[in-house]
Amino acid sequence: MAKFHKLIVLAVAALAVSATLAVAADRKQAKSQVEFGIRVAAQGLWREAIYRWERAAELDPTYPAVWNNLAVGYEQSGQFEKAKQAYEKATALDPHNAYIKQNFDLFKEINDRANRANPR
């Protein structure tokens, strides 16, 4: 019985280690997609950037930079509701990130100003 218990403990430990390695691999792949998205966004290729950042979000939905970059991309492509949702997700994941907060505050200010100028 003790031998069986040890085998179960070892199996659970191995599963935990493999899950941790999978998460680290996902973050690494997500980071690669984020960086590629930044490069193509700098060239004005916003659809490609959004595609890369959406792929990164699939790989690692807990990565705040993904959601911040997606929000910026959505803003650039006129998808303001999606931008707002992405900023909210980024803020929820990293509430103390000054860069995300600054981007979201600027988005809200511009969006509010546009809505006041052109009420529906």
Stretch-by-stretch model annotation:
Residues 30-31, 64-65, 98-99:
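Helix-start (N-cap) detector for alpha-helical repeat units in TPR-like alpha-solenoids
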